[in-house]
A protein has these predicted regions:
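Active-site-proximal or metal-binding-adjacent scaffold patches in catalytic folds
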Residues: 1-154, 163-206
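Walker B catalytic acidic pair
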Residues: 159
Length: 206
């Protein structure tokens, strides 16, 4: 649809509006309703072309910096934001370390927030840093092991807030802010680091 940019198209009856996303791997995805005419989709892409090219360029520059930083971390890993020798750890080891931390912190923070959860798990290839199911089952991404403990605690608070508010309403964010006043800075920090952490973990054996 755009001559110089490959685009993956996802069509579904569940999709209600046209949207354009760029994944961390720089894949451009156009989501469109089944009923959307091709001409409308093409016009939408033309409208978004300038933004798309500018954003892709910025992300490519960011990736270039990322690769240069990864070179300085060859055979290194971060454990709670501390540099360690990657050869001393497997993914299983890191999972146990993060799980132990969560087993200690989750009940403490849940008690402070006057809420509860039914179960929690740590996932190796999670697409999100954390999630909370309708039945209050919590899930956390293994890559959080690389982050500072304060940032991990923010994710814990974020997911526990979902046991109270099943959305991202003003009440939800008010709840998060009550227990994590600097959540915005921590959220932005994690957003900037997530790809870096993911790449760091790729050098480890299961």
């Amino acid at each position: 649809m755009l001559d110089d940019i490959p685009i993956t198209i996802q069509k579904s009856k569940k999709i209600k509006t046209l949207s354009l996303n760029i994944t961390p791997s720089l894949e451009v995805i156009l989501k469109m309703p089944d009923s959307c005419p091709q001409a409308r989709a093409s016009a939408f892409l033309k409208e978004q072309e300038a933004w798309l090219k500018k954003t892709l360029l910025a992300m490519q520059e960011k990736y270039s910096l990322l690769h240069s930083r990864l070179n300085t971390y060859k055979d290194k890993i971060l454990v709670f934001d501390e540099v360690k020798n990657a050869n001393d750890y497997t993914l299983t080891d890191l999972k146990k370390i993060l799980k132990t931390y969560l087993e200690r912190k989750l009940p403490l923070i849940a008690q402070k927030m006057q809420t509860s959860y039914t179960h929690f798990s740590v996932r190796n290839n999670a697409k999100v840093l954390g999630s909370c199911s309708y039945h209050n089952r919590l899930s956390f991404a293994l890559l959080l092991i690389c982050a500072q403990k304060e940032a991990i605690d923010y994710v814990i608070i974020h997911e526990l807030a979902h046991t109270i508010h099943k959305n991202h309403s003003q009440n939800f964010w008010r709840c998060v802010k009550t227990f994590c006043p600097n959540y915005r800075a921590l959220r932005e920090h994690l957003k900037q680091k997530v790809v870096f952490y993911t790449q760091l973990l790729k050098q480890l054996q299961p």
